[in-house]
Regions:
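Cleavable N-terminal signal peptides
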Residues: 20-21, 32
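Bacterial N-terminal signal peptides that target proteins for export
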Residues: 2-18
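Short, surface-exposed alpha-helix to beta-strand junction/turn motifs within ectodomains of secreted
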Residues: 56-81
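A glycine-anchored, Pro-Gly-centered beta-turn/N-cap motif
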Residues: 97, 102-108
């Protein structure tokens, strides 16, 4: 093996360049990689709550755009109702108020646009007693 060919690898400028690239990869903000995943909800998944009015709070793993996000409620009759999103308490949270709910099984369906530009969706089934 010719040592003259590989000695350029250990030169200080090359080591510094590798360190900079590794530093950028390790410490760069992760916002661009983070889809909005639901991390907490009120009502909770498969929970039982008292009606007729229910406060909704959905917390996600990253910032979301409320203007391009939707909430709908599937009621016990199988009908889908649009839910109005209230002002955001924080960039990762959606809130709303559900009123006039009767006893039965419901599913809160959500679709959010995350800061990374990806749309994620899901549902939170719950019961009203």
């Amino acid at each position: 093996m010719d040592l003259r060919r590989i000695t350029w690898i250990v030169r200080p400028w090359f080591v510094a360049a590798i360190a900079v690239v590794c530093g950028i990869a390790l410490f760069a903000p992760r916002v661009a990689l983070a889809h909005a995943v639901l991390v907490e909800s009120q009502p909770g998944v498969n929970s039982t709550v008292s009606g007729p009015d229910v406060a909704v709070l959905l917390k996600y793993s990253s910032r979301i755009d409320p203007k391009h996000s939707t909430l709908t409620l599937l009621n016990p009759d199988g009908k889908v109702e649009k839910v109005t999103i209230d002002s955001q308490p924080s960039p990762e949270v959606l809130s709303a108020k559900l009123t006039g709910l009767v006893k039965g099984a419901y599913a809160l369906q959500w679709q959010v646009l995350a800061a990374d530009g990806h749309i994620t969706r899901g549902r939170v089934p719950f019961q009203v007693k």
